[in-house]
Amino acid sequence: MTVPTDAAGHGRGIDVDALLLVSFGGPEGPEDVLPFLRNVTRGRGVPEARLAEVAAHYDRFGGRSPINDQNRALLASLRERLAPMPVYWGNRNWQPYLADAVARMRADGVRRAACFVTSAFASYSGCRQYREDLAAALEQVGPGAPDLVKLRLFFDHPGFVEPMVDHCVRALATLPVAVRDEARLVFTAHALPRSQAAASGPDGGAYERQLRAAAGVIAQRVAACVGTRHEWQVAYCSRSGPPSVPWLEPDVNDALAALADGGARAAVIVPVGFVSDHMEVVYDLDVEAVRTASERGLAVARAGTVGTDPRFVAMVADLVAERRSPEWERPALSGEGPSHDVCPLHCCDPGARRPAAAGVPADLCAHGPARSGVTASQPGRPANAERSRHGEPRNEATILVDERAGTSRSDSHPAGE
C-alpha cells in the first residue's frame, strides 16, 4: 500500500471503509489469567511462580480485567457514532485477537481500515509495537487482508484534554476544603526504560515531551475552571524489570511520599497516560498509590479517565475524518501537536527492526530477525506469538521481567492494558 503523505507526515485524502479499535486485551475470568500472562511474557523465561504472584493482583478483582468491558463500551459508542461505517475490535494479548479482527474484516469485504490505538503518546510499546502486531496479523491472514492506516496520536486533542480537565476539577472537589486549593496535580503515565523513552517518536524523546505538553495544557485549563493555579508534575507507575535498567522517574509512590515530606497536604492523581480504568489504574493507583498517600497523611483523590466520554468518542470520529479529507481541521492544544498521520521509517523503533504495518511502506519490509512459523489463530494465542521465539532482542519494557518477588508493583504492561 502506498499512503500519500506530505513533508510533515500527513496522510490525507485516504478512503477508509472501517475502523479497527486496537488494544492490549485482558483476562475475562480466573481461568484466563495465567494463559493471558503467558501470552504477554511468551519467550522471556518468566517462571510460573512469578506469573502466579502477578495473577494474585487480578484475584482482587475476581480474576477479570476491567479493560475488556471498557473496550466493549467504547466499541458500542463508536459504532453508534460512526454508523454506517463498521467498527471492529482486536487485541494484542487476548481475545478478540488482532488477526481474528483482520480476518473478519476480510470476510466482510473491508478494503482499508483506519486503526485507533488506545494509547495517546509516542513510544515503542504504545505505538510501534501495535504496528508490529498489525503486521503479524496481516501476514497471518494472508491475501485479501485489508490495507491498514493508523490514526494519529491524540495526546493534546481537545477531545482528550477537555474530559481530563473535567475529571481533575471533579477530583479536586472531593478533597477537604481546607487543603483543596493547595493540592498538587500528579500526572501519571506508564514508566518506560529510559532507552525506550529516548527512542520515542521520529526524533527521540517524544514520550516525555508529549506527557509534559498534555499535563501543562490540562493544568492550565483546570486553573481557569477553579480559579486557582495548582502546581503539577509528571510521575510514572507500573515499572517492572531489573534494577540495573534505568527507567523514567519518579515513581508515583516516591513522588507522593516526597510531596508529603515536603509539607504538601493534598494531591490529585491524574492518570493522563491511560484512557480507561484498567488494571494499572485500579490497582497501581487506586490501591498502591492511594495507600502510599494515606500512610503519609496526604489527602488524595484520583481523577477519572476519558473512557466513553462523548467528546472522546467524537474525537475518534474526527480523527477518521482527518484521514479521509485533506480539508478537515487538525486541532491541537499544545506546541507538540498535531502529531503526524503516517509514522516515519523506524519511528519509535528501539533497534529490533521488525516489520510494522500502518506506516510508510518501507517499514513493512523485514529488517531484523525472521518471523517464521506464524500460523492460524489459536485460542489463547496471539498472532505474534511466534515472534519472541526467534532470538529477538529482549524488550526490557515488557512486564514481569523482574523475577524477584514483590519488586514489581503490578502486572506492569508497558503501554497500559
Question: Language-model segments: what does each one mean?
Answer:
Residues 407-416:
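Short, intrinsically disordered C-terminal tails of secreted or membrane-associated proteins
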